[in-house]
Amino acid sequence: HRLRQPASFESGGEKGGLFKSIDGGITWKKITNGLAKGSSGMIDISIHLNNPDIMVMAYEADENLPEDEPGTGVYISYDSGESWKFLLKHAVRPFYHGQIEIDPINPNNIYVVSRGFMISNDGGKTFGPRRWRTDGGDDHDMWIAPYDNKIMYIATDQGSRLSIDGGSTWLSHNNMAIG
């Protein structure tokens, strides 16, 4: 079982996991194909706007898995979430880190929004660190315009950042705390 006390927090549990409904939530099926075994915690999924068969997921798995088994990190599905392929070991924290976004126009662009912000431009074959600097501390959230993938916002510790050129340059709005 997981520990929850004022000075400690462990997310997830044995009954957690990824569940799918295709009847408006009347029935649910637990999805396990390709996912880490054992308990799971925080999960974030992004579905491609023009092809809902393509999904990417940030998945928090049991921290005691053997090193050679897929665990916490990034997964991708090409069949509407019925099965998943492990792409990248990456820390997915249970609080505000671990959001994932798939570019609404180009599904090869995957953004893992966290303290260690990672980007793939080849459908998850490789990942690298973000190519821009936002001077905002930890990244918490991201939005990409569905009609123009060059327009994006990032929410950080200090406020928000707007780019209209795909992340080459950023306009900072440091007047709000986000996270």
Question: What is each PLM-predicted segment?
Answer:
Residues 1-179:
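Beta-propeller blade termini and top-face loops
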